[in-house]
Amino acid sequence: MKNSSILLLLVVFFVISSSGEAKTCSDGWTCLGPKEEDKCKENCMAKHKGVGTCNLYTIPEFPAPITYYMCDCMFDC
């Protein structure tokens, strides 16, 4: 009985403590590189109240790699 009470208490504590955590979500759209970094940050803040960065991505495809810029917007759900 004592062990099951301790286990129940731990489960309840875990559920309560994990329910208050903010989850991180993301959104993304194309941007034109570092010159649009400020626009990426402004749009991310306006749409989601988050932090946006314009990042270069490369897909190593044959015969030539594909590169593109994406605005990665990270925000609390």
Curated annotation (Swiss-Prot):
Coiled-coil regions listed in the entry: none
Main location: secreted
Cell location: Secreted
GO biological process entries: defense response to fungus; killing of cells of another organism
Keyword tags: Antimicrobial, Disulfide bond, Fungicide, Plant defense, Secreted, Signal
Disulfide-linked positions: C25-C77, C31-C54, C40-C71, C44-C73
Signal sequence interval, chain numbering: 1-22
GO CC terms in record: extracellular region
Keyword Disulfide bond annotated: yes
Family the UniProt entry places it in: Belongs to the DEFL family.
Protein name, as recorded: Putative defensin-like protein 185
Organism (species): Arabidopsis thaliana
